[in-house]
C-alpha cells in the first residue's frame, strides 16, 4: 500500500488524475473525509473538471476551512512546477517528507512499510542510473505502470504467455510449449 501511495503522490504531481488524488488526498489525515470528497465529486461532475481542480476551486468554501487541503494544493503546485530538471529520487523524497507521509509511517511504527519505501527509492535511483535521456517523471511513471499492469493478477480465466525461464517455479493446471525443436528443449546435454 505504501508503494502505491508514494507512486500516487508522483502521479498526482505529473497528471493530477482522480485515482491518485483519491488515494492520497487524506493520507496522512487532512480531514478530507467522505462528506467532503462527495462534495468534490459532485462539484467536479457539475463543472466538468478533475477532483484536484475541484479542490483548488473550493479551498475558500466553508466546508474546507478546518482541513489541510490548502497545504496539499500548495505542495502539489510547488513540486509540480519545479519538477522539470530535478531527479525523480529527489522529488520522491521531497514529496514523502513534505506531505508528512514518511513521518506518518514512522509514527505508525511499521518498519516493514518504511523498508518498502526505501526499496522504492532505491529502484528510482537505479532507474535514473540506467534511464539516460528519458529519465523524466512521466517516463518513470509509464515504466512503472507497465510492471504493475503486467504483474496484476486478474483472477480470471486467461492465457498467460511467457518464456520457459519466466515460468520457472510457477504452477499452472495446463501448460503448452510451442515451437519445440528436438534436441534444443529439452537439451541433449540434460
Predicted regions and their residues:
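Conserved helicase C-terminal RecA-like lobe
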Residues: 4-190
Amino acid at each position: 500500500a505504501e508503494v502505491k501511495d508514494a507512486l500516487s503522490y508522483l502521479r498526482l504531481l505529473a497528471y493530477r488524475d482522480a485515482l491518485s488524488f483519491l488515494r492520497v488526498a487524506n493520507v496522512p489525515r487532512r480531514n478530507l473525509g467522505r462528506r467532503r470528497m462527495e462534495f468534490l465529486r459532485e462539484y467536479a461532475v457539475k463543472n466538468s473538471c478533475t477532483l484536484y481542480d475541484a479542490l483548488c476551486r473550493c479551498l475558500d468554501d466553508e466546508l474546507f476551512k478546518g482541513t489541510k487541503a490548502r497545504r496539499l494544493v500548495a505542495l502539489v503546485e510547488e513540486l509540480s512546477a519545479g519538477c522539470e530538471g530535478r531527479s525523480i529520487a529527489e522529488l520522491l523524497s521531497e514529496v514523502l517528507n513534505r506531505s508528512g507521509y514518511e513521518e506518518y509511517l514512522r509514527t505508525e511504527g511499521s518498519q516493514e512499510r518504511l523498508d518498502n519505501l526505501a526499496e522504492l527509492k532505491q529502484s528510482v535511483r537505479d532507474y535514473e542510473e540506467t534511464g539516460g535521456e528519458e529519465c523524466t517523471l512521466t517516463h518513470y511513471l509509464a515504466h512503472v505502470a507497465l510492471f504493475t499492469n503486467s504483474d496484476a493478477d486478474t483472477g480470471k480465466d486467461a492465457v498467460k504467455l511467457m518464456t520457459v525461464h519466466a515460468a520457472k517455479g510457477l504452477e499452472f493446471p495446463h501448460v503448452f510449449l510451442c515451437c519445440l525443436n528436438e534436441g534444443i528443449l529439452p537439451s541433449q546435454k540434460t
